[in-house]
Amino acid sequence: MKKQHLPIECAENGRKAGRQVLLKLLIMIVCAATVFGLFGGCGGSGENNPTDAPTPAQTIRPTAAVPTETPMPTRAPLVYSPDYHKTTPLMTKLVGEQAIKAARMVIDAFLKGETSVKFGFDSYEPTFAMNTVFAVNRMCPPFTAFALCNDYRDFDASTGVLKWKIINVEPNELDEKLQKFEAVAIDFMSVLREGDNETERALLLYSRLTAYAQYDYEAYENPQNLTEDEYIYRTSAYSVMCDGMGICYSFAEAMTFLCAQADIDCIEVNCINDSIAHQWNLIKLDGEYYYCDATWDVGGTFNYFGMTTDERVKDSGGIKAEDMRSLSVSPEELLDGVVPSDTRFAVLREHVTSMPVTVEIDRVNDRAVFTVGNESYSISCGN
């Protein structure tokens, strides 16, 4: 299967309702301007289009670093059930403790089939509703797919009440959709074992998502053929996890949810400018920060896992470090001046370039073993 880049699109708050509609329309206009001339299209246009660059050699070189000892499972299967209250430190830092507390209240009400919640806080910042809904959509993907909530229109600061309406499902069928998602989440997490470290967990979940899901070209290229509610569903993390179809912020939100469930610090990052509109993830592994782009690794590759800022910007079709944002916050501001620069995973872009790639964890030696056909390459997962 030949590697091809995917279309680029993004939405900062992800929902095509109220204020978000304008943002998504802007994104679609940017993407429409860039997609001309692309083969399956992502990025800018013309001679500098990264999709026009030669595809990396479809080879994977063996290395003596691959252990000769047969990996043996040494850890028990992970005991897991979905926890919609879990979030990440980066998310909490981005939106604030009050928004996280409010998000948990919204989630609890939604899971009961309710369509409003009264918060009862003493005061509300102007960005309170936006931050709360942003957090809810990442902590509870079913809310994104089956609830329509405009953070400004549907919040009344004078009463502290936030409202939403159920969409894409009959109210009496919501429980069935929740059960489906929870079963899928359990299946995703089944690749992990008790005691797996952060790097092992991240590699396994990333591989599970990129090898399973596909890019939804129809939703991206022909949104006019979908109703607003259908578009919300098709571009949700719920869709990419349950139906195996999504676009860039579907993949990015799914990674944020999965990482939160696996106790990995993670948040989405986007870039919107005249050349590109795209969304991916910022992830923290063993004390270092990296960028990961599951959308561009669809098919089960690792070309965009564990990138530095320089690697993220290089051959990206127009991504610029100064245009990167989580909500309205730059990654550098979010990380208190830290710029992702650790090159630990650069070897993957040198040695693991074919698709599909399978990854297994040698838990005896704490190594990740990447295999294509009969050839393998391994890296250390140790701290």
Annotated model-derived regions:
Residues M1-T74, L205, D243, I247-S250, ...:
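Gram-positive cell-envelope targeting signals
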Residues S250-D315, F370:
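Hydrophobic/aromatic-rich core segments of domains that either
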Residues G96, G113, N197, D216, ...:
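Helix N-terminus capping/helix-initiation residues
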Residues I167, G195, M241-M245, Y249:
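Short, charged/polar micro-motifs that form catalytic or ligand-binding hotspots
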Residues T34-G37, G41-T199, L203, D315-N383:
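N-terminal accessory/pre-domain segments preceding catalytic cores
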Residues L174-V240:
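Secondary-structure boundary elements
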Residues C10, C31, C42, A102-A103, ...:
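Generic recognition of cysteine residues
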Residues S236-Y238, M245, E288-A294:
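Short, well-ordered strand-loop elements centered on a beta-strand within folded domains, enriched
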